């Protein structure tokens, strides 16, 4: 099952509505590149979610016969990630017989500058060295972390999709998918979407596929549900209890946690939710396939992310055969945190205790030198000096354990 917002996205610039100014700026920019005199090496394409930033970049590549290399900056964020994927592409030629390449870095405002050290610097270096045009997208271009990028790029803003173009698009989809949508429901979707075409299309698909008809009552119920993100426990319950694919998919896409962590949560709790061993097998089979699609998506083919979400949500939900029976009722189970998180937490606690001890030792030496040269010997005879170091109970317990291992 492909998401409708991907299925019906414009393939050419002429099909992109309500963005005439942005289209003109992008065309002038790309033509300056093709003529060998770029007026800017990179463009920062910005606008609210769902207005078509990625779609516009893809349509530009299509119309000018450019090979598009797409990379999600908020998932491949460290300096080495940026360099290894994007920089190589900027140096080597295309193998597809196109006129050249267009590099797309999606969601640069999703970069966490504290955790992803060097990512912004990596992008700045890429802008300086690239031999091909570079487009970046951002919902919030005024993020302080993007200041240097703003100074090095041509900024192009996108408008929200107007009500009339959005209405035409939704009616076209209803006709193509043979979905009946009441006028009141259509108006409600358009009003609540606030120009976010992806949100509107996803809502239309979620209800249309589940019920075959889109009514105001159903739309209002879904809109209330999507006003807040679901915590992991709510997400699991909605996925495992879902009887329809769209219900499970909505739960997954409304989760507070990202797709990597969601897979860990689902994996940990499949054996808890499903009693039948065959149901467990089918659920893990769907989850393993989701992991494969997710890995391929991270390799640059982000359209595959939709399939990963389908499998980790709808695929897992459909694993329980008993759901097909009319009298089926969901079983309440007590879900648990992934053991992976618990191990990480325990490991961090151990490292923190060790580091506090090393800080006490490293009075006349650096931390790293003490860790590598002094600490291994200290474990052997630490009991002679524990009082002088003012070790607390937790640190003593750690040293007792470490000296035995």
UniProtKB/Swiss-Prot annotation:
Which of this chain's residues are annotated to bind ATP? Answer: 47-54
Please tell me whether the keyword Signal is annotated for this protein: no
Is RNA-binding a UniProt keyword of this protein?
Answer: no
Could you tell me the keywords of this UniProt record?
A: ATP-binding, DNA replication, Nucleotide-binding
Q: Which GO terms describe its biological process?
A: DNA replication
**SUPFAM superfamilies recorded:** P-loop containing nucleoside triphosphate hydrolases
GO MF terms here are: ATP binding; ATP hydrolysis activity; DNA clamp loader activity
Q: Describe its partners and assembly state.
A: Heteromultimer composed of small subunits (RfcS) and large subunits (RfcL).
Family note = Belongs to the activator 1 small subunits family. RfcL subfamily.
Q: Mind telling me which NCBIfam families this protein's record contains?
A: PRK04195.1-1, PRK04195.1-5
Task performed by this protein: Part of the RFC clamp loader complex which loads the PCNA sliding clamp onto DNA.
Quote the HAMAP family the UniProt record gives.
RfcL
According to UniProt, the name of this protein is Replication factor C large subunit
Protein source organism: Saccharolobus islandicus (strain M.14.25 / Kamchatka #1) (Sulfolobus islandicus)
